[in-house]
Amino acid sequence: MSHHYVVTAQKPTAVVACLTGNFTSPTDLNLIIARNNQVEIDLVTPEGLRPLKEININGTIAVMRHFRPPDSNKDLLFILTRRYNVMILEARMVNDVITVVTKANGNVSDSVGIPSEGGVIAAIDPKARVIGMCLYQGLFTIIPMDKDASELKATNLRMDELNVYDVEFLHGCLNPTVIVIHKDSDGRHVKSHEINLRDKEFMKIAWKQDNVETEATMLIPVPSPIGGVIVIGRESIVYHDGSNYHAVAPLTFRQSTINCYARVSSNGLRYLLGNMDGQLYMLFLGTAETSKGVTVKDIKVEQLGEISIPECITYLDNGFLYIGARHGDSQLVRLNSEAIDGSYVVPVENFTNLAPILDIAVVDLDRQGQGQIITCSGSFKDGSLRIIRIGIGIQEHACIDLPGIKGMWSLKVGVDESPYENTLVLAFVGHTRILTLSGEEVEETEIPGFASDLQTFLCSNVDYDQLIQVTSDSVRLVSSATKALVAEWRPTGDRTIGVVSCNTTQILVASACDIFYIVIEDGSLREQSRRTLAYEVACLDITPLDETQKKSDLVAVGLWTDISAVILSLPDLETIYTEKLSGEIIPRSILMTTFEGIHYLLCALGDGSMYYFIMDQTTGQLTDKKKVTLGTQPTTLRTFRSLSTTNVFACSDRPTVIYSSNHKLVFSNVNLKEVNHMCSLNAQAYPDSLALANKNAVILGTIDEIQKLHIRTVPLGEGPRRIAYQESSQTFAVSTLRIDVHGRGGAKPLRNSASTQAQNITCSSNFLPKPGGGNSTAANAEVGQEIDVHNLLVIDQNTFEVLHAHQFVAPETISSLMSAKLGDDPNTYYVVATSLVIPEEPEPKVGRIIIFHYHENKLTQVAETKVDGTCYALVEFNGKVLAGIGSFVRLYEWTNEKELRMECNIQNMIAALFLKAKGDFILVGDLMRSITLLQHKQMEGIFVEIARDCEPKWMRAVEILDDDTFLGSETNGNLFVCQKDSAATTDEERQLLPELARFHLGDTVNVFRHGSLVMQNVGERTTPINGCVLYGTCNGAIGIVTQIPQDFYDFLHGLEERLKKIIKSVGKIEHTYYRNFQINSKVEPSEGFIDGDLIESFLDLSRDKMRDAVQGLELTLNGERKSADVEDVIKIVEDLTRMH
């Protein structure tokens, strides 16, 4: 049996619907946004959008509409899911908390209906009498509205129109009247139907208009008293009300398809239109008073400016509108009354959207065991790379350019009673600089008692309103009030101070092997004891373990030569415990600290690794030794307080915050490239902040409370499709699609983008034959015709600058990409597969595999081989090129002559779209035949089919979990796991890949990659997870699939079953129903997968509900079976959350 845990690390970001209404109260103006299975409710305020609530739906949202019942003063929400579940939602205030309740729900599916080719469409009558839906061909589904009904019951009305593109209800009609755009053999037509709600049937055709524009796809109903409908086509706009007809054909419309609209004015005279080019238009209806009332006399359209490619638009208020997008970032924009640089559109805020994620690369650029995800996100002009890593963010408030800092401390100087620090001391080689913080101003100053001509080793406020400065020469005690030197201690002889540590009452100084213990008194420094150790001191610490005490009874010392940590007692400096640190790397920083009442000793080494121990406060004994790798450079440990808890900041090339959760240490990366020095700063202008120094500057900022995903955008201006990483050249290769327009002088890019602005640009020689006489190539394109131009971009791994762009001549397209080391060749190559896509051909007949070498800022084509058809997938396979070409899987070897020679192939697929390899085994994902496992017999030079999944599935991605277990995703948003049965007794059983686990994710996975978002092997983990596979989806979600053992699965499954009963979903769709594995009419229960999103919701429950959820649960702890209590389960679930 195969057991897996699947959880979302990044929720879906693509917006599928948005609307504005009075949902939470009659006076609240709400923006409501739907993303896949989530609804976000925001409040529109003068300051901007304020999130109020986020709700999860156990279903994939297909349509979201709002309406206002006749007897209500606020709006209700109607949602239709992909599985035809319907619900009406209402917001209510319960104990001053907004609660979304399900007023009515139901399922409107039909077991014999043929799904509509135009997709799922729904509309609501303006008087809220009926909801109408086009779900199946030839049927119009209605739900009559009954305010007292809790169940939504549907009736199907027979409809002559089969191919329906849009449906709306007309305003101002006595009976509900629906209008449709449909298509038949004669063209596209608009027709209206009046509905008899009592008999639940169509009464008559109110009016119709035959032969509208052949590409008309959208209807806009016009409110009363004007009435009628606006028909939006590719080239024209028509207004029609049955008798009155007006049309306009704006020239700019021909460039792209209008796909969404928003009504601006309640009288229905102004509408915003958005198209697939990301252009925003305003449509004006001109009216006139006649004997029949107000009628439309003309239509005007004005182009306003550029926006993200919209999926939906809603007008908020006062010239603000929200652009919901699924190809790029969603936006809040403002419309200006005057044009600025030809545009009336002013972007106000962008909302990150990763969708659609077509490919991902998981890289560990810093070699820290922590994955950084680079996604190919977005489409067309909104395409980008997104750099995603998990960590703790620093919110930067100020930056001071100061290179060469060797140490940094914050002080409170002067007699001011203010609790705030006002001084920053910066140490440099050979001198010290002092900065005064006055508000947000930073000025250089002096403290007369400090030795400014020497490098400071340590600085601190100490008892009796005094300051300490330690240099290589001496320890200086300075009055905070007068800033004058009041006492000084110097080491005897010609010794110089090398290492120092202090608290508010004690100082510990080391010079080579000698240690001096000094007590701070009022106006004096008293040396109390000294001792010579066997080896030279590398680092030391005198921090009190008890936070309520000012002085410490213990000293921690790190020694050279024998590489050890030594605990000394005070005041006599006697050795009470010695811990040998294995290896030859010296300790560079040592720290005693207390987390959640447990005392620890942390000891960081010169190679970026760190040992940590539990420490006995009385005996100094160190136990429970553990080691983690935090960076690659020497690490300095400093404490700071955040939210009244102690934390440790590890300064290095990979800065890390160390804290404790449930009595376990947690190590979280900080999203800064490098931090050499750090100190707490609580200044008036920068309260509860940190000062962080790198080699060039000081950053003043605040630290996030929790670790989370941090996303950086690299805009490309064209659509990225595939990505590969090459460590040897420190570059990424990205294949992109750019849209050019054919003009009189040839093809021209529509806009500047990554491929047009690269440092170097080359163009492919189009050696390929031109089928059909070449009449489809770019050279013979018509003026104004759009041309797909594919590019290979080489991008620097650190700066993400486009170093080289290689353009392929249309109609040659890039279908696959990888980086590979081939044969005995010392070079690493980029391997690119292309195909010739001719519109007149059902599928490409010819393509090529090209070998590129990037070296010394030059991209050189080394070799190429012609292939028959499209190469959908490339994989490096034991130093060879494995390719899925049409229905073949082929293996090419790299010869000494730098040529690709086909070694073997196998043909038993419809289309080999996806390939993964491990050892001699190859996993093939087929277009519609699920997955097949092949083995390469090296001695015979052949492929052999080992086993296959005989259940047909339209595949989207595959991955090898281990030698016998294989993960797949298919087009209906399902995940499944098949397992090879090596112990099978018959050949027939051995040739099958039985499906052992299945799960409905509710989103289509496009790519799987092995890797982790968090640092591996860091800290203590109680959850027995094995391996980690990341996935990216169409809707911009990133998730994790990991394997778990049987007993842990049983425990989590028990918790999952209890949570299903305790957590009531909005919309009343059962969790079990939602996660059912469904392909067309075939439905199977979810099995072998644990829903991590549901498990993690345990942490959001009240304590009473937590107790209910764990009642009767048993778990195994330290080899013993016991009844689970709330604390046990909290620890386990929190541990699971640390995967992301």
From Swiss-Prot:
Disulfide bonds: none
Transmembrane regions: none
Molecular functions per Gene Ontology: DNA binding
GO cellular component annotations of the record: cytoplasm; nucleus; site of double-strand break
Pathway given in the UniProt record: Protein modification; protein ubiquitination
Disruption phenotype: Reduced tissue growth in the wing imaginal disk.
Family: Belongs to the DDB1 family.
Name of the protein this chain belongs to: DNA damage-binding protein 1
Species assigned in the record: Drosophila melanogaster (Fruit fly)
